[in-house]
Amino acid sequence: MATYSSNDFRSGLKIMFEGEPYAIESSEFVKPGKGQAFARVKMRRLLTGSRVEKTFKSTDSAEGADVVDTNMNYLYNDGEFYHFMHPETFEQHQVEEKTVGDSAKWLQDNAECIVTLWDGRAIAVQPPNFIEAEITDTDPGLKGDTAGTGGKPATLSTGAVVKVPLFVQIGEVVRVDTRSGEYVSRVK
C-alpha cells in the first residue's frame, strides 16, 4: 500500500495505525510560531468504531490501510452470523453479530448494504441510508391529541422503534432514515 505523510492526511483517508485500520475524520495542520509543525488528527478505529485524537509530527508517515468498501446484499441471520452476498460474484461473507451492531435493526432481506472488508474479513456493515418498512405495532392516534410533540412510538417489521406522526396506523409502510433513525414519510 501507499505511504502517506502527515501533511497528506485528509478526511476519508484510511490508514494503518498501531497495526489496525483507522479512518481519518478530520485533520488540522498546525504550524506554531516556535517549534516543529504538526497535524492534529481525529480518526475512527474501524474494528470497534471508537474515536481517537492523535497528534502527528510533520515528519511522521502512515501506511495506507488495505480496506475495501463493497456493496453486498443482506441474505439472512442464522442466530450467530449475518450472511451477505456480493451481487456480481455471488461470493458470500458471514459477519459476526457484534460487527453488525446497531445496524441489525435496519437490515431487510436482499437490502444492499456497504460491507467494509479488511484482509478479506468483514469489519463493518452500513445499512442503506433509507428503508421502507411496515408498521407492526403502534398506539392509535386520538384526534386532537397534539398537546405534546405530535408523535408516537411505532415498531417496524425489522424490529426497530421509531417516532412517527399520530396519523400513521398499523399496517402502513413508512420510509425511515437509518442514519438518524427518524421517520421521513409514508409510502403509498
From Swiss-Prot:
It holds the Pfam family EFP_N. InterPro entries: Elong-fact-P_C, NA-bd_OB-fold, Rib_uL2_dom2, Transl_elong_fac_P/YeiP, Transl_elong_KOW-like, Transl_elong_P/YeiP_cen, Transl_elong_P/YeiP_CS, Transl_elongation_fac_P. GO terms for cellular component: cytoplasm. GO terms for biological process: peptide biosynthetic process. May be beta-lysylated on the epsilon-amino group of Lys-34 by the combined action of EpmA and EpmB, and then hydroxylated on the C5 position of the same residue by EpmC (if this protein is present). Lysylation is critical for the stimulatory effect of EF-P on peptide-bond formation. The lysylation moiety may extend toward the peptidyltransferase center and stabilize the terminal 3-CCA end of the tRNA. Hydroxylation of the C5 position on Lys-34 may allow additional potential stabilizing hydrogen-bond interactions with the P-tRNA. SUPFAM superfamilies: Nucleic acid-binding proteins, Translation proteins SH3-like domain. PROSITE patterns: EFP. Keywords: Cytoplasm, Elongation factor, Hydroxylation, Protein biosynthesis. It is found in: Cytoplasm. Gene3D superfamilies: 2.30.30.30, Nucleic acid-binding proteins. The modification N6-(3,6-diaminohexanoyl)-5-hydroxylysine is found at K34. The keyword Protein biosynthesis applies. GO terms for molecular function: translation elongation factor activity. Transmembrane segments: none annotated. The keyword Secreted does not apply. NCBIfam families: efp (TIGR00038), PRK00529.1 (NF001810). Belongs to the elongation factor P family. Involved in peptide bond synthesis. Alleviates ribosome stalling that occurs when 3 or more consecutive Pro residues or the sequence PPG is present in a protein, possibly by augmenting the peptidyl transferase activity of the ribosome. Modification of Lys-34 is required for alleviation. This is Elongation factor P. It comes from Pectobacterium carotovorum subsp. carotovorum (strain PC1). The gene is efp.
